[in-house]
Amino acid sequence: MSILKIHAREIFDSRGNPTVEVDLYTSKGLFRAAVPSGASTGIYEALELRDNDKTRFMGKGVSKAVAHVNKTIAPALISKNISVVEQEKIDRLMLEMDGSENKSKFGANAILGVSLAVCKAGAAEKGVPLYRHIADLAGNPEVILPVPAFNVINGGSHAGNKLAMQEFMILPVGAESFKEAMRIGAEVYHNLKNVIKEKYGKDATNVGDEGGFAPNILENKEALELLKNAINKAGYSDKIVIGMDVAASEFYRDGKYDLDFKSPDDPSRYITPDQLADLYKSFVKNYPVVSIEDPFDQDDWAAWKKFTASVGIQVVGDDLTVTNPKRIAKAVDDKACNCLLLKVNQIGSVTESLQACKLAQSNGWGVMVSHRSGETEDTFIADLVVGLCTGQIKTGAPCRSERLAKYNQILRIEEELGSKARFAGRNFRNPRIN
C-alpha cells in the first residue's frame, strides 16, 4: 500500500534539544518515528542538519530538516506511489534526491525519520511485527533476543565528572532470558547506587545523559572497582561481564591521549597509544572486561590494528566506522576492530543500516546495536536488534524512560515469541542460528 500523507515536526529529545519526528499515513493508519542525536559524534557521520539560528534553541533547531520532509520528500514519495514494503526503493529515492555523499542537502535526520516510519508502515502492511519485517529485509529466517549492555557509570562527554572514559557497562551474559538479564541489570544498578552513595555521598548518585551514575572520580580503574564491588554485592559475579566505551577521539591530542581532558590543558600528562593500550590490557587482566569500544581516535588506524591483533576481546568500532560501509570495508581490510557499533542515525537510512550490519557480519564481526545519548521514546532499535540477530544492544542504564522504552519493548517481544524466544547469552558476539 502506498503512502497517503507524510508530516514532520520538531519535537524534543531527552536532553531538551529539538529533533525530527515523522508521521506517515497509509490506509492501515498512522506510523510515527523520531530521530535520535549524539553528543560525542564521529567526524565521518552523516550530516545531522541543524538550523544554526542562534536566536532559536541555541542554533540547534531542526526546522530546515522538517521543511525538507514536508515540502520536498513527502510530495515526491506520495507522487511515486511506491508501496511501503519496498524499503530499499524508497530509501534509494531519497538518497538520489539528496545527491550528497553525507546527506547534507536534506540532513540525515530528515531522511532517517521518513525511513524509520516507512519501515514501521511496511510491517503493518505485511501484518507482521516490526522485528519480523526487519528480519525479512535482512534475509534472516529466525530472530534472536540480545544481551543488554547497561551503561551504569557515565564519564567522558556524557557527564560532568572528571572521568575520561565515556561508558562502563554491565552485560548479564549468564542470564537464561532477556527478562532475567533485565532483572540482573536492575539489581546490580541498585547495588551500585548504594556502593557509590556510601563511598562518595548522596550527590554522587546523580545520573548522566544515559541514566548511569556519574560520580566525580578521575581514575578509570576506580569505575571498574565500583562495578566489581556492586556485581559481587548483588551476587552475580558468575553471570556478568563488563564492557567499556572509551570514546577516545574525545581526548586525542596531537597523536597522544589526555586522560584528564576535562581539566586545564597540560601536554606533559599526555600518554602514547602504546601506553593507553597497556592500560586497557591491565583492565582486561584484572577485571572481567570483554568488550572495549573506540579505544583510540577515529583516525589512529595503526593503534587500532595493533591493539586488536594483541587482545582476544571484542574491539568495537563506533567513531572509527560510523555505520558507514566504506569505513567498515577499510576496517575489515586493516583488521582494525572485530565488532561494529550500529547507529541508524550515523548513516541515515534503514537500508544502509542493514547493509552495514550484513557487511560486518559477513566478515565475521560482531554487531552491537546502539542508541544515542540524545534519545526519544521511539523504540525502533529494540525491534531492529531482534530482527538483525546481532545478539547485543546498548541503550543506557535501567533508568530514564527514553532508555527503558527500548528495553521494555524487547521484554514484550520476548513474551510474544514465547517458546520460540532465543536469548543470545554468552554467544552475544556471534549468535547466528545455523
UniProtKB/Swiss-Prot annotation:
Mg(2+) 1 binds at residue 40. Pathway: Carbohydrate degradation; glycolysis; pyruvate from D-glyceraldehyde 3-phosphate: step 4/5. The lineage of its organism: Eukaryota, Metazoa, Chordata, Craniata, Vertebrata. Its cofactor is Mg(2+). It is an enzyme of class 4 (lyase). Disulfide bonds: none annotated. Substrate binds at residues 158, 167, 293, 318, 370-373, 394. The keyword Metal-binding applies. GO terms for cellular component: phosphopyruvate hydratase complex. It comes from Alligator mississippiensis. This is Alpha-enolase. Mg(2+) 2 binds at residues 245, 293, 318. Binds two Mg(2+) per subunit. Required for catalysis and for stabilizing the dimer. Belongs to the enolase family. Pfam families: Enolase_C, Enolase_N. One of its GO terms (molecular function) is magnesium ion binding. It is found in: Cytoplasm. The keyword Magnesium applies. It catalyses: (2R)-2-phosphoglycerate = phosphoenolpyruvate + H2O. One of its GO terms (biological process) is glycolytic process. Its main location: cytoplasm. Homodimer. The active site is at 210 (proton donor), 343 (proton acceptor).
